[in-house]
């Protein structure tokens, strides 16, 4: 079970997430929609530089141009990129040619069962998928605080050949159930881990990581017994 804390906006929050047991942090750079989590590339670079060992900084971007994304990857020094845009297969192939060793995660919004058909062409060019919730009313494509239909996500996990990360309204209170229902490769939370000032709350992060790991091992043990 891999755990990502997204929407990191301070060095101290990145360090805290690492010490709480997160495997990755998300740095949201390259804005096209509404979000409180966007930071500029210079702050992202600083956070990447000061990340502790054994944690992966992920560039989360809404840009869809391969050249622009490549520029951000180069300048920030991230090892993974998460695409929240209408990137084409060809754009991802182009990005891969420039950075052959980078991990590429493609976002899809779970708006109905048909989403799996949109995902299929990307299976051969990405390293993983992330499933999130769309909030058109507030012009948000991520960090919406809204859950989607986990039964669809569960079906996607079974039918695609790439690892699937679950996002969308996850909190310390519901992450265990989400893992039991969906059985994803990883989970990703942002808004559900914030304090009243919009930064990451340490106790929420601790509880999220603990419950995610705990319920994953319960699911894993059951599968091994069967």
Curated annotation (Swiss-Prot):
Statement: the UniProt record of this protein carries the keyword Nuclease: no
UniProt-recorded name of the protein: N-(5'-phosphoribosyl)anthranilate isomerase 2
Pathway: Amino-acid biosynthesis; L-tryptophan biosynthesis; L-tryptophan from chorismate: step 3/5
Catalyzed chemical reaction(s): N-(5-phospho-beta-D-ribosyl)anthranilate = 1-(2-carboxyphenylamino)-1-deoxy-D-ribulose 5-phosphate
Keywords assigned by UniProt, alphabetized: Amino-acid biosynthesis, Aromatic amino acid biosynthesis, Isomerase, Tryptophan biosynthesis
SUPFAM superfamilies in the cross-refs: Ribulose-phoshate binding barrel
EC assignment: 5.3.1.24
One example of a Gene Ontology biological process annotation: L-tryptophan biosynthetic process
GO molecular function: phosphoribosylanthranilate isomerase activity
Source taxon at top rank: Archaea
Keyword set includes Isomerase: yes
Family: Belongs to the TrpF family.
Species the sequence originates in: Methanosarcina mazei (strain ATCC BAA-159 / DSM 3647 / Goe1 / Go1 / JCM 11833 / OCM 88) (Methanosarcina frisia)
EC category name: isomerase
InterPro entries on file: Aldolase_TIM, PRAI_dom, RibuloseP-bd_barrel, TrpF_fam
């Amino acid at each position: 079970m891999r755990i990502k804390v997204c929407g990191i906006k301070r060095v101290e929050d990145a360090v805290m997430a690492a010490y709480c047991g997160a495997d990755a942090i998300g740095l949201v750079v390259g804005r096209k929609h509404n979000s409180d989590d966007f930071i500029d590339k210079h702050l992202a670079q600083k956070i990447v530089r000061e990340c502790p060992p054994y944690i992966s900084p992920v560039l989360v971007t809404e840009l869809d141009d391969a050249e622009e994304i490549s520029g951000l990857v180069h300048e920030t020094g991230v090892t993974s990129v998460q695409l929240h845009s209408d990137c084409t297969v060809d754009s991802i192939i182009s990005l891969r040619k420039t950075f052959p060793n980078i991990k590429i995660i493609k976002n899809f919004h779970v708006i109905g069962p048909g989403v799996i058909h949109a995902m299929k062409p990307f299976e051969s060019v990405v390293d993983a998928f992330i499933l999130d919730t769309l909030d058109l009313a507030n012009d948000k494509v991520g960090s919406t605080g809204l859950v989607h239909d986990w039964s669809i996500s569960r079906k996607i996990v079974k039918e695609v050949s790439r690892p699937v990360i679950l996002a969308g309204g996850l909190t310390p209170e519901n992450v265990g159930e989400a893992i039991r229902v969906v059985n994803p490769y990883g989970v990703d939370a942002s808004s559900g881990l914030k304090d009243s000032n919009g930064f990451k709350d340490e106790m929420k992060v601790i509880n999220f990581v603990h419950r995610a790991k705990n319920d994953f091992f319960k699911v894993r043990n059951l599968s091994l017994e069967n």
